[in-house]
Amino acid sequence: MVYCCYYLYFCSIIILMIILLFIIVLWYGGLFFQTFFLHRYAAHQTYTMSKTVERITFILTWVFQGSNYLSAYGYGVMHRMHHAYADTEKDPHSPKYDLNIFSMMWKTKNIYYQINKQQIEVAPKFTKNVPQWKRFDDFASSWVSRLAWSIAYFSFFFVYTTSLWQWLLFPVVLLMAPIHGVIINWYGHIFGYVNFKSKDTSKNLFKFDFLMMGEGYHNNHHKHSSSPNFGGVRWHEIDVTYKIMQLLHFVGIIHLKPSPLLLKREV
């Protein structure tokens, strides 16, 4: 009887670890392609890659973001607008001009959709050289694709969950990209510290950004938007994504552009 209890306890721990590992892979996999491809490539073009590698990266972004897939074109254009209009009425997402997290994210969703479907006119400076694979984007952004991924996630939870409380983790999987957006675009403009004086409210959320792979160094990024390295101003600001990019540059998969030297902090 005692051995049976130990066995059941051990099995429940293993199953919980499988679920957590699944969520961790989706969290950091989706986040990596968001910051590496959508942000630092599509929006800021801090490096170059071949057309073949670009297409492979489109597909990998879809694989890891799944039902949360974000278009490089929609994201890249909207993010350029965010930098141009940061914390003004034209900013696609700003805590200063939105009542709460939900209203900000709803507005962001609508603007992103209108940009991606080219339903609104956008200045050429925001669209210049932003990568676009329209046929693939139309498929990856479709409700068929999103529903298929959602069913796959549901099936995983149906097979592995052993307690009702574990289903509380299911919405995290379905809403992972919006959660990433809230952390940076809401909390990253309210909490944290600054290295540089700025006209906007951008903050560095973490001393070591273990959660957002460098995205949390938001104040640094707003000061040096053309730099592929979001960290490096203080000794503890290690940008994990940039370290991976250096490795990809070393083996020839991408080619980092010369970036300006990081200035010493002003604050």
Where are these regions (language model features)?
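Non-catalytic, topology-defining segments of multipass membrane proteins
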Residues: M1-I183, Y217, S226-V267
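Active-site-proximal inter-transmembrane loops
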Residues: Y69, T127-K134, V194-Y217, H221-H224
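Glycine-rich, pocket-lining loop/helix-strand segments that form or immediately flank
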Residues: W186
